[in-house]
UniProtKB/Swiss-Prot annotation:
It is an enzyme of class 4 (lyase). It catalyses: GTP = 3',5'-cyclic GMP + diphosphate. One of its GO terms (biological process) is cGMP biosynthetic process. One of its GO terms (cellular component) is plasma membrane. SMART domains: CYCc. It is found in: Photoreceptor outer segment membrane; Endoplasmic reticulum membrane. It is a single-pass type I membrane protein. It comes from Canis lupus familiaris. The keyword RNA-binding does not apply. This is Retinal guanylyl cyclase 1. Residues 492-1109 are cytoplasmic.
Length: 1109
């Protein structure tokens, strides 16, 4: 293209370009001849026309991952696009049209960069072919429409024409759907390669298939892209819903796709290539593979892959006989349209797809101009005419409002050639036999088929079941439902009974669950019918001293290790528990509050021991046991001093318990001080709630209550015995008021009236006058006495609710907590504060020690490894693609050790390694270990740093070498300390080894080579391998190296090695390597450098060993 300024749409600015021809123009070009009018009118017309109207060159951009995907690059897009443009420009039919030029545009392989590539491309071209990444398709459509550029996508499943966007070059989704419909394979799974391009293609394809009604069961990614990742992906397919076909969204193995090779090999290993699944490659839909006698090398070289590929069906573009991609490539090369040195066997068939896309775009331009009479046309007009354009494609005629035909290719397990089985027309959805049937693995049939309803538009498929089977199943379900309805009632009650008599939530208790105790003194019958006062007076030690007894009708026992109380039902002929009783008790068992006694179960047992008559059946409610007895008993014990705080605490507990019951809609009906019990913490709890309801459900006749029991009963209940049995909420409030009188006065109800219980009950039942207790004003706060009298109101509606009573009572106590143990808590508050301060100090000391421990641990192991070991999680070995290792040792260390005391050797190494440790702190390196005089450092692990590892190690080595030049031993300062340094770069594996004193160790040939570089080095020299030198030169940071020459490395052979002698800008002094005498050792110290006294000592210790040196 000429050097003209480009405007939007990629067309030249008419003010800067001199067009070659004006009679015919590309899209947007009016084809009128020069206007024979005054120059001013012509200039005005030129300024009013769009810029693209004045261009004689139509630039086609071909966008794809040519630079980052080698298989796409093998399509030689530059040659394909130029070949198409050259043929278009030579076409006589297009002589009056624009000149076509092509430009190759790179598309990143990662999704985040695709949109930027599209945006950049639209500003440089008149028409665009691409993008490849489906994630950029929709944004590309919008950007192309805004820029007025015709867009021809070639790899966007589900893309519809519209605006400036033409239909996809290859209808991949339509063709694949037609194939699945022909074989009735509705349930499919998609496995994609891990690259962004294929992941997005899988998502777009699954959305397109689901939009057509197919149940895509799974879309998964093969990560990592090796055999292990393939196995995991196939296991997910196995574990998911049943599928018929697996669509492989990745490069075909026939083009060198390693992911598909691993996937097919894994399928063969897992037994999935046996015909139970069919594997369909996705990428072959975008180019043409042709059957023929030529053997496929990738199948011929691997018998396992050949067997696995037998389960693959390839749907690809159809080429006419003699017109395959390879045939056309040969003809183009023979006509010198392609370079003669081009290896056609290495060219991907995607070559033809690129060629066809450029021709389709050119055909759309020609038809659009023809329809406009040679006048100006927009990008949308070009895109609209592309489907109708009929052009000679690279593999047959394209366009003409018909989708290209496809062919279904197959192989067999014994051969390595492709043969055609069916011809597929996506437009009609027809499948015509090509003469050879499909060969399924092991000679079996297809992997089955799904109901045809999946492929019928507007029909909701019933999970893959035929309608007749659905109707039959419906009748069967109805029949089973009717049969089950007769069993449901029985099974429900049976299961409920099982749950009640077994398991952790059972409520039916027997002699196996409850252990009864015979109390000291008194007969059995007396204990059963007595109050809780006799049991409350017993100590724990007294109860535990009594041996276990058989059932003796006692009211106390042991259940699951806790004391329990049994409230016995009247009568002794209880054989079974009625279902209504179980239901009622289950609801009562759900009541849980700190001031309500917890019901644990229903005890049903038959006696024969303990004096009970044969056939006797005991039924009782088992509840938690409160050791201090009832409130009535507590008030009767005069040796217990009760102040107002104690009394208010008891009353507040009673009010809270009753408020909870009323909130749950439970009317007590039998509330009295004998039904209020106190536990060992002096917490009052309400008991016997719902007892009348249980009696009624069990159909037990209640004996008429005595006058003494009716002293707490409200007047309206005394007048209605039926209402008295059920109880009411206002009646409970009246009973509460009587209990308040008991607690305040510490006397029996109505004790101050000097009347018998019968007389009191009669006067309360039949006023006037009203019969109520009399309470002195000095016995309680005035507000409490007024609240008490409100509870005694004759009319039920005038009595306050429990919520109102609770609020009033709290105001009487001015919001203070009145629990009896609060006093003891206040006494411990000061001690608690002091204890908190002490704990805080100890915690701070512990945190300091923990920090010290963590600091020490991170000095021994990498922080990530240290954290994993502290958490107790295993540390998996990690592979590092490229690191640089440093090895160094002290020249003549054995001689120095022989001349030194052990403590002097330790001091030497400590001083030297302390110097090294200070230096490595300023570099991005990790100290691996020290063994004797050997010092090992690595960079690039455990934290990767790109290629910086070589520079970090090289800088550190220069710093260490400079520092060693001025280092002196404390015990032999006149003896120089010379070190040898070896560097090498390469891959390695790092991991933690051992459980006791675990070490972070490195493994691999890189470690051995780095050690060999050190051992073959020279004093005061940094010996560097070619791998490290290559990285240092790539970093271009001015590192200076010298060629040492060929060096024999143990186990590696002779290699070219180098000396690292400096770096640009490195001004620190570096010690001069000593001159080597012929025949002298490179790995020791000469005797002339050893002081006489030390030399004499060494000769004395090893006579004759150094005499010749």
């Amino acid at each position: 293209m000429s050097a003209c300024a480009l405007l939007a749409g990629g067309l030249p600015d008419p003010r800067l370009c001199a067009p070659a021809r004006w009679a015919r123009s590309p899209p947007g070009v009016p084809g009128a001849p020069p206007w024979p009018q005054p120059r001013l009118r012509l200039l005005l017309l030129l300024l009013l026309l769009p810029p693209s109207a004045l261009s004689a060159v139509f630039t086609v951009g071909v966008l794809g991952p040519w630079a980052c995907d080698p298989i796409f690059a093998r399509a030689r897009p530059d040659l394909a696009a130029r070949l198409a443009a050259a043929r278009l420009n030579r076409d006589a039919a297009l002589e009056d049209g624009p000149r076509f030029e092509v430009t190759l545009l790179p598309e990143p392989c990662r999704t985040p960069g695709s949109l930027g590539a599209v945006s950049s491309a639209l500003g440089r071209v008149s028409g665009l072919v691409g993008p490849v990444n489906p994630a950029a398709c929709r944004p590309a459509e919008l950007l192309a429409q805004e820029a007025g550029v015709a867009l021809v996508p070639w790899s966007c499943p589900g893309t519809r024409a519209g605006g400036t966007t033409a239909p996809a070059g290859t209808p991949a989704a339509d063709a694949l759907y037609a194939l699945l419909r022909a074989f009735r394979w509705a349930r499919v799974a998609l496995i994609t390669a891990p690259q962004d391009l294929w992941v997005e293609a899988g998502r777009a394809l699954s959305a397109a298939l689901r939009a057509r009604g197919l149940p895509v069961a799974l879309v998964t990614t093969m990560e990592p892209s090796d055999l292990s990742g393939a196995r995991e992906a196939l296991r997910r397919v196995q574990d998911g819903p049943r599928v018929r076909a697996v669509i492989m969204v990745m490069h075909s193995v026939l083009l060198g796709g390693e992911e598909q090779r691993c996937l097919l090999q894994a399928a063969e290993e897992l037994g999935l290539a046996d015909g139970s699944l069919v594997f369909l490659p996705f990428d072959t839909l975008h180019y043409a593979l042709s059957p023929g006698p030529e053997a496929l090398a990738v199948l011929a070289n691997s018998s396992q892959l050949r067997r696995a590929h037998d389960a693959v069906l390839i749907l690809t573009r159809h080429c006419p006989p003699g017109g395959s991609v390879m045939d056309n490539l040969r003809r183009a090369q023979e006509h010198q349209e392609l370079p003669s040195d081009l290896d056609l066997q290495q060219v991907s068939p995607f070559f033809g797809t690129i060629y066809d896309a450029v021709l389709l775009l050119a055909g759309g331009v020609a038809r659009a101009r023809a329809a406009a009479g040679g006048g100006w046309v927009s990008g949308a007009t070009v895109a609209h005419h592309i489907p109708d354009a009929q052009v000679p494609g690279f593999c047959g005629t394209l366009g003409g409002a018909q989708e290209p035909p496809f062919v279904l290719l197959d192989t067999d397990a014994a051969g390595d050639r492709l043969f055609a089985t069916y011809m597929l027309d996506p437009t009609r959805g027809s499948l015509l036999s090509a003469g050879t049937p499909v060969h399924f693995p092991r000679g079996g049939g297809t992997p089955g088929s799904d109901p045809s309803c999946w492929f019928e538009p507007g029909v909701i498929c019933n999970g893959g079941v035929e309608p007749g089977l659905v109707f039959l199943g419906f009748l069967l379900v109805v029949g089973m439902g009717l049969t089950g309805a007769f069993l449901a009632h029985y099974l429900r009650h049976r299961l409920l009974h099982i749950q009640m008599v077994s398991g952790p939530n059972k409520i039916i208790l027997t002699l196996d669950d409850v252990t009864f105790l015979h109390p000291h003194g008194g007969s059995t019958r007396k204990v059963v019918q007595g109050s809780r006062s006799s049991l409350a007076a017993r100590s724990t030690s007294d109860i535990r001293s009594v041996p276990s007894q058989p059932l003796d009708n006692s009211n106390i026992g042991l259940f699951e290790g806790d004391w329990v109380w049994l409230k016995k039902f009247p009568g002794d002929q209880h054989i079974a528990i009625r279902p209504a009783t179980k239901t009622a008790f289950s609801k009562l068992r759900e009541l849980r509050h700190e001031n309500v006694v917890l019901y644990l179960g229903l005890f049903l047992g038959s006696g024969g021991a303990g004096g009970s008559a044969a056939g006797e059946g005991v039924l009782a409610v088992v509840s938690e046991h409160c050791a201090r007895g009832s409130l009535h008993d507590l008030l009767a014990q005069r040796d217990i001093k009760l102040d107002w705080m104690f009394k208010s605490s008891l009353l507040l507990d009673l009010i809270k318990g009753m408020r909870y019951l009323h909130h749950r809609g439970v009317a007590h009906g039998r509330l009295k001080s004998r039904n209020c019990v106190v536990d060992g913490r002096f917490v009052l709890k309400v008991t016997d709630h719902g007892h009348a309801r249980l009696m009624e459900a069990q159909r037990v006749l209640l004996e008429p209550p005595s006058a003494e029991d009716q002293l707490w009963t409200a007047p309206e209940l005394l007048r209605d015995p039926a209402l008295e049995r059920r109880g009411t909420l206002p009646g409970d409030v009246f009973s509460l008021g009587i209990i308040m009188q008991e607690v305040v006065c510490r006397s029996a109800p109505y004790a101050m009236l000097e009347l018998t219980p019968e007389e009191v009950v009669e006067r309360v039942r039949s006023p006037p006058p009203l019969c109520r207790p009399s309470v002195s004003m000095d016995q309680a706060p005035v507000e409490c006495i007024q609240l008490m009298k409100q509870c005694w109101a004759e009319h039920p509606d005038l009595r306050p609710s429990l919520g109102h009573i609770f609020d009033q009572f709290k105001s009487i106590n001015k919001g203070r907590k009145t629990n009896i143990i609060d006093s003891m808590l206040r006494m411990l508050e000061q001690y608690s504060s002091n204890l908190e301060d002490l704990i805080r100090e100890r915690t701070e000391e512990l945190e300091l020690e923990k920090q010290k421990t963590d600091r020490l641990l991170t000095q021994m192991l990498p922080p990530s490894v240290a954290e994993a070991l502290k958490m107790g999680t295993p540390v998996e070995p990690e592979y590092f693609e490229e690191v640089t290792l440093y090895f160094s040792d002290i020249v003549g260390f054995t001689t120095i050790s022989a001349m030194s005391e052990p403590i002097e050797v330790v001091d030497l190494l400590n001083d030297l390694y302390t110097l090294f440790d200070a230096i490595i702190g300023s570099h991005d390196v990790y100290k691996v270990e020290t063994i004797g005089d050997a010092y090992m450092v690595a960079s690039g692990l455990p934290q990767r740093n790109g290629q910086r590892h070589a520079a970090e190690i090289a800088n550190m080595a220069l710093d260490i070498l400079s520092a060693v030049g001025s280092f002196r031993m404390r015990h032999m300062p006149e003896v120089p300390v010379r070190i040898r340094i070896g560097l090498h770069s390469g891959p390695c594996v790092a991991g933690v080894v051992g459980l006791t004193m675990p070490r972070y160790c490195l493994f691999g040939d890189t470690v051995n080579t780095a050690s060999r570089m050190e051992s073959t080095g020279l004093p005061y020299r940094i010996h560097v391998n070619m791998s490290t030198v290559r990285i240092l030169h790539a970093l271009d940071e001015g590192f200076q190296t010298e060629v040492r020459g060929r060096t024999e490395l143990k186990g590696k052979g002779a290699e070219d090695t180098y000396w690292l002698v400096g770096r640009r800008g490195f001004n620190k002094p570096i010690p001069k390597p000593p001159d080597l005498q012929p025949g002298a050792s490179n790995h020791g110290i000469s005797l002339q450098e050893i002081p006489l006294d030390r030399r004499w000592k060494l000769e004395k210790a090893r006579p004759g060993q150094f005499s010749g040196k």
